[in-house]
Amino acid sequence: MTTQVPPSALLPLNPEQLARLQAATTDLTPTQLAWVSGYFWGVLNQQPAALAATPAPAAEMPGITIISASQTGNARRVAEALRDDLLAAKLNVKLVNAGDYKFKQIASEKLLIVVTSTQGEGEPPEEAVALHKFLFSKKAPKLENTAFAVFSLGDSSYEFFCQSGKDFDSKLAELGGERLLDRVDADVEYQAAASEWRARVVDALKSRAPVAAPSQSVATGAVNEIHTSPYSKDAPLAASLSVNQKITGRNSEKDVRHIEIDLGDSGLRYQPGDALGVWYQNDPALVKELVELLWLKGDEPVTVEGKTLPLNEALQWHFELTVNTANIVENYATLTRSETLLPLVGDKAKLQHYAATTPIVDMVRFSPAQLDAEALINLLRPLTPRLYSIASSQAEVENEVHVTVGVVRYDVEGRARAGGASSFLADRVEEEGEVRVFIEHNDNFRLPTNPETPVIMIGPGTGIAPFRAFMQQRAADEAPGKNWLFFGNPHFTEDFLYQVEWQRYVKEGVLTRIDLAWSRDQKEKIYVQDKLREQGAELWRWINDGAHIYVCGDANRMAKDVEQALLEVIAEFGGMDTEAADEFLSELRVERRYQRDVY
């Protein structure tokens, strides 16, 4: 691996030090280099005195701390942009991921900015769960000397819109913190709100924080950014689909696809635990149906991000058509004066239920009206990429990336409907067809750095995807650590995803144990959480041996049920009461021994 070295004048190392560094890292793999980068970042964080060559007295350097609490990457991008704005203003700033934040130091923060998303039913992002729990515990300190601001990202189609940000904002104030600015709650189309908020934060902090010397602002403004790539959410790679294979049986109620995408010579890199972002296009048939229901032609010009496009093209490429929201229902009702929908206006619960059960196209079908093209565009939300847990390791598949896609299919009064991204991959992209993708790195879902560490993987349904990547990596590394998989689905014969591969891993000794839960193969429904309780004694032995626990899948039901089962196992076999078991599991989370990728 070769790296272009910056001019020596820009380096903090002398030529001899640089030569030693290059010699020490010349034969390291990308994964090893990434680990070394994170290691030195940790060393740096533990030695604050080394951050500046000539540190000023603490009273002159209160500094600004930005905590990024991100689930899909959007909050992290906003936090990074704010960090860059503050550095440009020559302010002393530090950006830290919530999962890396030593939250007991929060009492010493003078200027604190929180950028957070929300997941599930109003829960904080995975990396912020421990911080959230600490702030809401009896251990939380008073924050009378802390001024703070919160930017909250969410999706108004969900009931608990921006709840995590609301929680942080109210709790920081309750603990005595002073609001620099009122909290901002941003919807899916958050960019404009974020840009305005960042400018206000910079203005507010200029009067609070001293301007730092360049060496100080650069040093303390550093952040653990080990991933560099020319491809991103806003500049995706045009890759090609090479395999689209249905991996559920013909009689299964589920349509699950194994998708392989060829990355070519792009150099795009990922690690087990990362997600693949997929930009999709809406079904042309769905676009045609919606346009005709509104008595439009499809060639009407509309403005999208400053460009003029035909309506059909705009709807296919730029707007969300397969997810309805309470706001869309309410706005459509108001625009059209629909006798069916107007009674729902003002009743949040009824609006959300209607949106959850009635796609946009069927809302228009059931409550027909005539809208002009611009009115339709203004009603809709921008199309956003979907994220899929990566189901492969480049140690085995090299220039490919695999994902496991559960295709969303359902009927509305006899008319077939489907999910936007899942049906795009399953039905509309031909072999070798183009798929625009990017990697969403997830450092909060990583294999242990020590290959001897045991691993417990809990992933029912398509939640099995990242564990396929984990096993490919552990096999390639010849990691001696034990591996235990818990998997569940409705039927053994129809829904055992990647069955042959798991059987091979068991035979080869890579997979030490596998416990399977088939919920519909017997009268009594059995789920993975039941298997956890059944194997409680052995599970506790693995935990005592230092095992790392990973959970992937549904956030609203499965993940909560699994966590409850883990708490029961810890309490019973660890001889703890409920409160102590909860504290024990929280400590595992802080130690990165309990990680979740839930959605």
Swiss-Prot record:
GO CC terms on record?
Answer: cytosol
What does the record list as coiled-coil region(s)?
A: none
Any idea which positions bind FAD? 322, 356, 386-389, 404-406, 410, 419-422, 599
Give the GO terms filed under biological process for this record: cysteine biosynthetic process; hydrogen sulfide biosynthetic process; sulfate assimilation
SUPFAM superfamilies in the record, alphabetically?
Ferredoxin reductase-like, C-terminal NADP-linked domain, Flavoproteins, Riboflavin synthase domain-like
Pathway(s) annotated for this protein in UniProt: Sulfur metabolism; hydrogen sulfide biosynthesis; hydrogen sulfide from sulfite (NADPH route): step 1/1
* PROSITE patterns, alphabetized: FAD_FR, FLAVODOXIN_LIKE
- Residues bound to FMN are 70-75, 117-120, 153-162
Q: How is the cofactor bound?
A: Binds 1 FAD per subunit.
Q: Which residues form the FAD-binding FR-type domain?
A: 234-448
EC top class named in words: oxidoreductase
List the EC numbers from the record.
1.8.1.2
Q: Which reaction does it catalyse?
A: hydrogen sulfide + 3 NADP(+) + 3 H2O = sulfite + 3 NADPH + 4 H(+)
Instruction: Describe, as the record does, how this protein assembles with itself and its partners.
Output: Alpha(8)-beta(8). The alpha component is a flavoprotein, the beta component is a hemoprotein.
Instruction: Tell me, in a sentence or two, what this protein's role is.
Output: Component of the sulfite reductase complex that catalyzes the 6-electron reduction of sulfite to sulfide. This is one of several activities required for the biosynthesis of L-cysteine from sulfate. The flavoprotein component catalyzes the electron flow from NADPH -> FAD -> FMN to the hemoprotein component.
UniProt-recorded name of the protein? Sulfite reductase [NADPH] flavoprotein alpha-component
The opening ranks of the lineage are:
Bacteria, Pseudomonadati, Pseudomonadota, Gammaproteobacteria, Enterobacterales
The gene designation is: cysJ
